[in-house]
UniProtKB/Swiss-Prot annotation:
Compartments, as annotated in UniProt: Plastid, Chloroplast stroma
Modified how: Glutathionylation at Cys-136 decreases its ability to be reduced by ferredoxin-thioredoxin reductase and reduces its efficiency in activating target chloroplastic enzymes.
Nucleotide-binding found in the keyword field: no
Coiled coil: none
Protein name: Thioredoxin F2, chloroplastic
Function description: Probable thiol-disulfide oxidoreductase involved in the redox regulation of enzymes of both reductive pentose phosphate pathway (Calvin-Benson cycle) and oxidative pentose phosphate pathway.
Recorded family membership: Belongs to the thioredoxin family. Plant F-type subfamily.
């Protein structure tokens, strides 16, 4: 039986990204990536229920990320969709001929937090593309390994279900150039 995919966000599927109002929280902007330890660290995702902007940890946050599950695989343009090992490939396939940009990050990575608002802005600018985020925690380690991640953040650009470009580190200009190259090529 073919998998049926819903292409609109579920009203209960919103999660806030962990960007603090003070920026990188003490991380130097010179550092552009974090190494992923071999052991892998399972991270806890904080959820906001009433849109009040406070995570479980008590930190204020700024932007919103859509989260999906296999039951509600959501592909939308103009926003960032949080994926996991179970929903990534179905969403990439559902995107059809659209270019897919994937941000592979961790909750504890300072440079990932610094570039997250810029990544969100790109999703709003490039309405003809699908922007995804994958938390490279222990649960998603098999997919991260399959995609060949060594550092976070790593950005993968996919066309026709294949990786065509990769940018490692929080290098906004390089990411922008890779997106433009994928669009024109």
């Amino acid at each position: 039986m073919p998998l049926s995919l819903r292409l609109a966000p579920s009203p209960t599927s919103f999660r806030y990204s962990p960007i603090t109002s003070t920026g990188a929280g003490g991380f130097s902007p010179v550092k552009q990536h974090c190494r992923i330890p071999n052991s892998g660290v399972a991270t806890k995702i904080g959820f906001c229920s009433g849109g009040g902007g406070v995570l479980d940890s008590g930190r204020r946050i700024g932007s919103c990320v859509v989260r999906c599950s296999l039951e509600t695989v959501n592909v939308t343009v103009g926003q960032v969709t949080e994926v996991d090992k179970d929903t990534f490939w179905p969403i990439v396939k559902a995107a059809g001929d659209k270019i897919v940009v994937l941000d592979m990050y961790t909750q504890w990575c300072g440079p990932c937090k610094v570039i997250a608002p810029k990544y969100k802005e790109l999703s709003e600018k490039y309405q003809d593309m699908v922007f995804l985020k994958l938390d490279c925690n222990q649960d998603n380690k098999p997919l991260a390994k399959e995609l060949g991640i060594r550092v976070v953040p790593t950005f993968k650009i996919l066309k026709d279900n294949k990786v065509v470009k990769e940018v490692t580190g929080a290098k906004y200009e390089d990411l922008l150039a890779a997106i433009e190259a994928a669009r024109s090529g």
